[in-house]
Amino acid sequence: MAKEKYDRSKPHVNIGTIGHVDHGKTTLTAAITTVLARRLPSSVNQPKDYASIDAAPEERERGITINTAHVEYETATRHYAHIDAPGHADYVKNMITGAAQMDGAILVVASTDGPMPQTREHILLSRQVGVKHLIVFMNKVDLVDDEELLELVEMEIRDLLSEYDFPGDDLPVIQGSALKALEGDTKFEDIIMELMDTVDSYIPEPERDTDKPLLLPVEDVFSITGRGTVASGRIDRGTVRVNDEIEIVGIKEETKKAVVTGVEMFRKQLDEGLAGDNVGILLRGVQRDEIERGQVIAKPGSINPHTKFKGEVYILSKDEGGRHTPFFNNYRPQFYFRTTDVTGSIELPAGTEMVMPGDNVTINVELIHPIAVEQGTTFSIREGGRTVGSGIVSEIEA
């Protein structure tokens, strides 16, 4: 059979497996790749066994060491990138650093145990970092003889999801056995196909970066005599064209409006700049001293400057090059957003006296300058230029 060409016409979706240790996340990942390879053979659908997924290579993301397995597969209608983090700490780091941006996730719960502490923590983290769509896979149903027990476990999971503002009563719950499917039991293979049909239909197609409102973090500013001020940087999302009205947001109290009079890339004029492009933007009516690194150029009204927010953070361990000692309330490090450091103070949650290296915690932050942030913006926490933590904005306060 001739090799298929990679089909870019299929929508691409990022998903992952989450849930308590030993509930079968990695076995399910292996089962999905294996069953799809049997049922929908293609150059993309290659079976991956448990060992190869479990032996995930170490990666460094913003100074943090994370073990993550990335696998890809496709259904009849979509192409998926699937992330599986072997250890609980890896999972937490993945979520908080934004290394794994998931459009949706499969929550794996062993029917033999029901929801466990990490089940709860992963649901909470999904809520905090903006994973909006969860599908439940109740694993190991072949080990439970009592139908009523399965119903109880399902109710318990649904209640837990509702507690964290997921639609617990309505979201899909699929009961199966990843191991049996992996071993080739057709009944359980059918359930894996049903799970993938559910993922196809329940997790909406993500909005493409180019369809989102413009956001361009300013890296450099210079003036061209007779033409005006140029701001350069990499377009984070959206598009920019000549004659677009934009806003310059952050650092300064006032948000300034301006009009784009030119878009250049590698010294060539462009009709439009797209997400991912490194561009220079010529701005009319902006003085050289009215814009600086650390601000963002954005579609008017799409993002606002803030000084106070709640964040979900992971503090590097000593082995990762982080602090050697804990920090306490009112700790004042630098927060690095996109292209700049801003000092801020940290307020710890009630009842938390200190944070140890290697911990993850929810904090309240107050910055000394306003910065363009929104829910889901990631940041690093730094001391004297070295990274000591990593976080994501979970809620805007002011």
Curated annotation (Swiss-Prot):
One of its GO terms (cellular component) is cytosol. Residues 10-207 form the tr-type G domain. Signal peptide: none annotated. Keywords: Cytoplasm, Elongation factor, GTP-binding, Hydrolase, Magnesium, Metal-binding, Nucleotide-binding, Protein biosynthesis. One of its GO terms (molecular function) is GTP binding. Residues 139-142 are annotated as: G4. InterPro entries: EF-Tu_GTP-bd, EF-Tu_GTPase, EFTu-like_2, EFTU_2, G_TR_CS, P-loop_NTPase, Small_GTP-bd, T_Tr_GTP-bd_dom. Residues 63-67 are annotated as: G2. It comes from the Bacteria. GTP hydrolase that promotes the GTP-dependent binding of aminoacyl-tRNA to the A-site of ribosomes during protein biosynthesis. Belongs to the TRAFAC class translation factor GTPase superfamily. Classic translation factor GTPase family. EF-Tu/EF-1A subfamily. Monomer. This is Elongation factor Tu. It comes from Streptococcus pyogenes serotype M6 (strain ATCC BAA-946 / MGAS10394).
